[in-house]
């Protein structure tokens, strides 16, 4: 166990923080932020988009959202527009990245050393922008190493292997396994569609090995399978971006909660078998384009019993899915698990919600729309108000309405937790490609019809012809209510940079004197309202008899609680979190 003194993470930022429960616009994202992750040991996030024209560089009007008059291009002679950006959230500086292959609707998870593994994507679409120097992304693996990396002179970028995946995948899901391998599940082998179809469905899963060795052959996954007769059965075909969560268990097994359409189970991906069948979730499909918010509720000490929360999304009504207001919880480790109805969303039906786990144990839900479903111009009535869900409160009191944004965050928007305890919010691009206006196309007189896999979709566009949701480049910061007490927050002054499982260690934190909680968090990979692998874990912790602001802490007892990786470590006193520091959890 290596011990370090915290000298770099605060840098006086607290004095500049906004008042509680507020949004503020801070910068431009550099590309339409369809995907986002936080590289460990850095003050940055990485934004990714699919490839198309881009006017999101310097010159974006942060008040009106008007785009830059200048195209944002790569600095080489490739003629490519920028579609990957490292965004420094303390200074709002941009650094161009080169993903090299089409990242459209990709997935991602971290290796144990903090390397992001960004997988899959789409074929090339030459109609929108020059793709001469771009590669097909469907079987691609892109690795992005952890920091630190100085913005000035930094050369960190994606290491790209175009044919590493065993099959083509568009809209898969990835999470980290107990041994540090990355699991890749599902998808379609053709892009530019909204609903999956049996002829292009990819009902399999595969691994990317943490040690670099050759992965075993991909395996079939029954929960993703359906025939042509079910192409218009939303409970079956709404199965893209399946919801996955690693479930704590004493055996250390890779038991993973899996939800696809309305079907759910706990699957052992290590032994390739169903561990436990679960009942179908009520109300219809909850995965893309149903796109519900799903979260593993914060894990507490004393057994780490898991509860999965699923809120909102869209129904399977054809041709116009309805945004759903309901929330359900399930405890998959129960002997006979059932879906229990929870408090409903207070502002009515909402789809494409981003659920972000906060260090105080609450979950903020934001973005999306109150009408329609995910996918292109499929939605209307943007959800502008953030909601805070408190799992510790009694049923009937769990939701609180929070701050309201002035920026619509529709399809292809994101939100992610920063080490400051605030939430970065970006993106929105219903057109999918670059569109400075954001209106549905009426010239071909086909509205509300649109194409899907070479033919007319059985769904309708639900965005009104009068509405406009252009490609959005503005970046906001959402300040949760606890930031009103930022001046009195704890301050981590010393901590171990790495620990092993079930290891006792100490943290020094100024201002942590009573009602102290210590948590580890994983922000995951965020896209399309799905937060791949995100989790918040409370650690056993007591104030040390040694004094001097010391806290005695015990790490998780096995990697089903938190897989090996680099995580944000928080100290919370009376509900007020410190800024986070980075700590590695090792096998």
What are the residue ranges of the model-derived segments?
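Beta-propeller domains
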Residues: 19-25, 37-99, 119-150, 226-373
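Beta-propeller blade signature
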Residues: 79-90, 131-152, 197-213, 263-268, ...
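Blade-edge beta-strand/turn elements of extracellular beta-propeller
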Residues: 19-25, 90-100, 144-166, 185, ...
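Beta-strand/beta-sandwich contexts
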Residues: 25-33, 483-516, 581-587
């Amino acid at each position: 166990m290596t011990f370090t003194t915290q000298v770099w993470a605060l840098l006086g930022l607290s004095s500049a923080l906004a008042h509680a429960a507020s949004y503020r616009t801070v910068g431009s994202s550099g590309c339409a932020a369809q995907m986002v992750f936080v590289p460990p040991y850095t003050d940055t996030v990485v934004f990714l988009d699919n490839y198309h024209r881009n006017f999101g560089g310097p010159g974006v009007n942060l008040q009106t959202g008007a785009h830059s008059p200048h195209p944002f291009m790569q600095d080489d002679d490739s003629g490519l527009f920028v579609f990957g950006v490292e965004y420094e959230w303390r200074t709002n500086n941009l650094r161009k990245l080169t993903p090299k292959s089409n990242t459209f609707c990709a997935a991602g998870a971290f290796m144990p050393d903090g390397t992001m593994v960004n997988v899959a994507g789409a074929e090339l679409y030459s109609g929108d922008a020059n793709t001469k120097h771009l590669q097909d992304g469907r079987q691609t693996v892109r690795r992005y190493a952890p920091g630190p990396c100085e913005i000035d002179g930094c050369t960190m970028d994606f290491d790209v292997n175009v044919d590493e995946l065993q099959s083509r995948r568009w809209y898969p899901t990835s999470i980290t396994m107990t041994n540090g391998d990355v699991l890749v599940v599902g998808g379609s082998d053709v892009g530019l569609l909204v609903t999956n179809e049996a002829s292009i469905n990819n009902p399999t899963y595969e691994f990317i090995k943490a040690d670099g060795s050759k992965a075993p052959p991909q395996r079939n996954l029954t929960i993703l399978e359906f025939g042509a007769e079910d192409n218009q059965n939303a409970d079956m075909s709404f199965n893209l971006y399946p919801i996955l969560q690693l479930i704590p268990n004493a055996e250390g097994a890779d038991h993973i909660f899996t939800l696809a359409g309305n079907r759910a189970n706990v699957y052992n991906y290590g032994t390739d078998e169903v561990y436990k069948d679960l009942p179908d979730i009520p109300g219809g499909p909850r995965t893309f384009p149903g796109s519900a918010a799903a979260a593993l509720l914060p894990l507490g000490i004393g057994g780490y019993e898991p509860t999965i929360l699923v809120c909102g999304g869209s129904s399977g009504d054809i041709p116009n899915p309805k945004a759903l207001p309901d929330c359900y919880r399930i405890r998959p480790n129960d002997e006979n698990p059932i879906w229990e109805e929870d408090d409903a969303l207070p502002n009515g039906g909402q789809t494409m919600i981003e659920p972000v786990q906060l260090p105080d144990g609450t979950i903020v839900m934001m973005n999306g729309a109150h009408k329609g479903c995910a996918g292109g111009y499929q939605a209307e009535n943007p959800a502008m108000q953030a909601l805070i869900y408190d799992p510790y409160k009694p049923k009937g009191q769990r939701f609180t309405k929070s701050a309201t944004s002035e920026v619509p965050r529709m399809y292809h928007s994101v939100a992610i937790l920063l080490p400051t305890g605030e939430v970065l919010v970006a993106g929105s691009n219903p057109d999918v490609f670059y569109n400075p206006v954001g209106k549905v196309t009426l010239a071909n007189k086909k509205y509300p019809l649109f194409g899907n896999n070479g033919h007319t979709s059985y769904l309708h566009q639900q965005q009104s012809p009068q509405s406009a949701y252009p490609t959005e480049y503005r970046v906001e910061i959402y300040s949760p209510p606890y930031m009103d007490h930022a001046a009195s927050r704890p301050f981590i002054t010393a901590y171990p940079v790495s620990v092993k499982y079930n290891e006792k260690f100490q943290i020094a934190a100024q201002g942590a004197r009573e009602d102290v909680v210590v948590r580890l968090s994983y922000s995951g990979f965020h896209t399309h309202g799905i937060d791949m692998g995100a989790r918040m874990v409370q650690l056993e912790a007591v104030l040390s008899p040694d004094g001097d602001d010391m806290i005695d802490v015990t790490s998780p007892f096995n990697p089903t609680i938190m897989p090996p990786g680099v995580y944000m470590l928080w100290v919370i006193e009376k509900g007020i979190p410190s800024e986070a520091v980075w700590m590695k959890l090792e096998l």
